[in-house]
């Protein structure tokens, strides 16, 4: 596993299709950002998604959380799995329904071939339910090794609008918040942020 030292941008995808789905997503965000080690910078709107693969199951609510952390990616994964367990996550069925699922999509330029933590996420480039909320939260984002999220989203066939293609629908009636530290802009708690300056 390789990657730069110091604080890094982390992209986290959250999903839930059991119980109170919105409350599960919010609880996941709250658990991840409860301490100083993971600082939220933006959270997307909520998207509703038809399940992909696995047994017949309810639709998902999905969102993307952007954060900054100096923790190693493995430690961030541990935090994600702890948050899942707090919401009663069970892993009995592959791609089965779940109260809360949190995936690390990217961690700056870090790469890993570890089967327990592959970075960047090996299927994110084809998942509209990850790309649509990520593009909303950071329109200038790139998925390392795959290119601009905007281009990947176009190929995935999801517009991100209400009734959009690809089984992904933006839920403007639902809202998530992320605790922001003093000095951060409150407008980053939900919805798009300005594209990052990615010049050299």
In which residue ranges do the predicted regions lie?
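N-terminal beta1-alpha1 ligand-phosphate binding loop
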Residues: 2-38, 44-48
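Flexible, gly/pro- and Lys/Arg-enriched active-site loops
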Residues: 37, 51-61, 71-183, 191-200
């Amino acid at each position: 596993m390789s990657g730069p030292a110091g604080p890094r941008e982390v992209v986290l995808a959250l999903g839930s299709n059991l119980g109170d789905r919105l409350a599960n997503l919010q609880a996941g965000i709250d658990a991840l950002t409860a301490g100083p080690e993971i600082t939220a910078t933006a959270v997307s709107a909520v998207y509703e998604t038809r399940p992909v693969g696995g047994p017949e199951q309810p639709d998902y609510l999905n969102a993307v959380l952007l954060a900054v952390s100096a923790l190693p990616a493995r430690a961030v994964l541990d935090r994600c799995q702890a948050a899942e367990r707090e919401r009663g996550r069970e892993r009995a069925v592959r791609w089965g329904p779940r109260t809360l699922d949190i995936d690390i999509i990217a961690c700056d330029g870090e790469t890993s071939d570890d089967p327990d933590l592959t970075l960047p996420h090996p299927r994110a480039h084809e998942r509209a339910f990850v790309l649509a909320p990520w593009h909303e939260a950071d329109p200038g984002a790139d998925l390392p090794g795959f290119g601009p999220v905007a281009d990947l989203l176009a190929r995935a066939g999801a517009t991100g609008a209400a009734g959009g293609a690809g089984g992904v629908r933006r839920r403007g009636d639902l809202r998530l918040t992320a605790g922001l530290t003093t000095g951060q802009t409150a407008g980053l708690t939900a919805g798009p942020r300005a594209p990052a300056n990615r010049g050299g």
